[in-house]
């Protein structure tokens, strides 16, 4: 299932409440402010702080 980019208008980083950006290559939502990447599973963003991966470790 593909990620619906319209969700970017309503979702926010659970840590800083800032905007998230979609990275199509890695299928992740990126918070540049916190340098965190959130996975997308079956088209659903997993916006849990404990599932976030630091950008320097994100694949």
From Swiss-Prot:
Gene3D superfamilies the record matches: 2.20.25.10
Entry's Gene Ontology cellular component terms: cytosol
SUPFAM superfamilies per record: Trm112p-like
InterPro entries: Trm112-like
Family stated for the protein in its record: Belongs to the UPF0434 family.
Protein name: UPF0434 protein Shewana3_2582
């Amino acid at each position: 299932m593909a990620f619906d980019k319209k969700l970017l208008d309503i979702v926010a980083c659970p840590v800083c409440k800032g905007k998230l950006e979609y990275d199509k290559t890695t299928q992740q939502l990126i918070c540049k402010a916190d340098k965190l990447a959130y996975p997308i599973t079956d088209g659903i963003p997993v916006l849990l702080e404990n599932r976030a991966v630091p950008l320097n470790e994100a694949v």
